[in-house]
């Protein structure tokens, strides 16, 4: 791991611990930097905002590649749903989505209005990439944007509801976050497939 990556990881872990313990709004950037042993300017070299600690990378822009790989003859919504479901079915995505850190990040967003809005804003880059992947002969920009927006809006809502309705996993039991409704990837897949009339 590069020094930059390890500093980013240290800042994220420190911030998440403080947010969980004290609440997102109660923790200033200067306190995060101090607890991590860096300057507040170093914090801003790694994260443009305090919100970015929680919402960055929740939606991987590489999802667009999975959408692009879906059969071109399918309707835009079908391609978008199937592509996102395929992307989150991959082992690295499932592993990340079952981690305690992922749960804590989404849970913070679910319980903090400014973060819920930031999750939706952060997903816009992925949404634009999905829309671009959906434009093929016979599919116009409007249809592609509508399908991408529907899928990303649904994904955001499903994840926020999943984290908001579940208790934190037992710290001593496992490092994964699951509930009676399933892990994040399962809940997300099931919810997205319902857009196609499936479950």
Show the residue positions of the predicted features.
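Hydrophobic alpha-helical connector segments
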Residues: 64-105
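Amphipathic alpha-helical packing segments from all-alpha helical-bundle domains
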Residues: 108-137, 145, 149
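Hydrophobic/aromatic-rich alpha-helical bundle segments in the mid-to-C-terminal region
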Residues: 120, 136-190, 196
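Basic, helix-initiating cap at the start of DNA-binding domains
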Residues: 1-22, 26-38, 55, 62
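A secondary-structure capping/hinge motif
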Residues: 51-53
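Residue-level detection of the helix-turn-helix DNA-binding "recognition helix"
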Residues: 34, 48-49
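Short hydrophobic/aromatic patch on the recognition helix
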Residues: 38-47
């Amino acid at each position: 791991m590069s020094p930059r990556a390890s500093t980013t990881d240290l800042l994220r872990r420190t911030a998440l611990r403080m947010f969980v313990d004290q609440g997102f709004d109660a923790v200033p950037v200067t306190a995060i930097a101090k607890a991590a042993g860096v300057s507040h300017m170093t914090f801003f070299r790694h994260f443009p905002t305090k919100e970015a600690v929680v919402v960055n990378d929740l939606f991987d822009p590489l999802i667009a590649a999975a959408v692009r790989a879906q059969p071109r003859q399918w309707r835009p919504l079908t391609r978008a749903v199937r592509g996102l479901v395929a992307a989150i079915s991959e082992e690295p995505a499932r592993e990340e989505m079952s981690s305690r850190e992922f749960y804590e990040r989404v849970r913070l967003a679910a319980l903090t209005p400014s973060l819920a809005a930031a999750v939706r804003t952060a997903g816009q880059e992925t949404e634009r990439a999905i829309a671009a992947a959906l434009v093929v002969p016979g599919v116009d920009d409007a249809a592609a944007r509508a399908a991408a927006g529907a899928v990303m809006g649904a994904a955001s809502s499903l994840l926020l509801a999943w984290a908001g309705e579940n208790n934190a996993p037992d710290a001593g039991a496992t490092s994964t976050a699951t509930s009676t409704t399933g892990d994040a990837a399962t809940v997300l897949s099931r919810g997205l497939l319902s857009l196609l009339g499936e479950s």
